[in-house]
């Protein structure tokens, strides 16, 4: 499936949260912390408002975006304003 964001939206593939602690204890899905970072997969057509490009790693607001599953992997469809920083 291919998703093309519109306007000032950005499609981000979210980073996976840790499933095990350093000591080897498995963390259940319900207790895993929601990740606030990911990789930009696609950028909407209103690109002059969005200061990120495909392939960059970004941090985003914790409760922002609409979750989307693409080929079994978690993604978020975010507004450009919900991106807080670029990770270098």
Swiss-Prot record:
PROSITE patterns: CHAPERONINS_CPN10. It comes from the Bacteria. One of its GO terms (molecular function) is protein folding chaperone. It holds the Pfam family Cpn10. Heptamer of 7 subunits arranged in a ring. Interacts with the chaperonin GroEL. Belongs to the GroES chaperonin family. This is Co-chaperonin GroES. The lineage of its organism: Bacteria, Pseudomonadati, Spirochaetota, Spirochaetia, Spirochaetales. The gene is groES.
């Amino acid at each position: 499936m291919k998703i093309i964001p519109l306007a000032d939206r950005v499609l981000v593939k979210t980073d996976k949260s840790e499933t095990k602690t350093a000591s080897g204890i498995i963390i259940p899905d319900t207790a895993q912390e929601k990740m606030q970072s990911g990789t930009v997969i696609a950028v909407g057509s209103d690109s002059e408002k969005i200061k990120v490009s495909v392939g960059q790693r970004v941090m985003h607001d914790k409760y922002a975006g609409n979750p989307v599953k693409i080929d079994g992997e978690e993604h978020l469809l975010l507004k450009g304003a919900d991106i807080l920083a670029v990770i270098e």
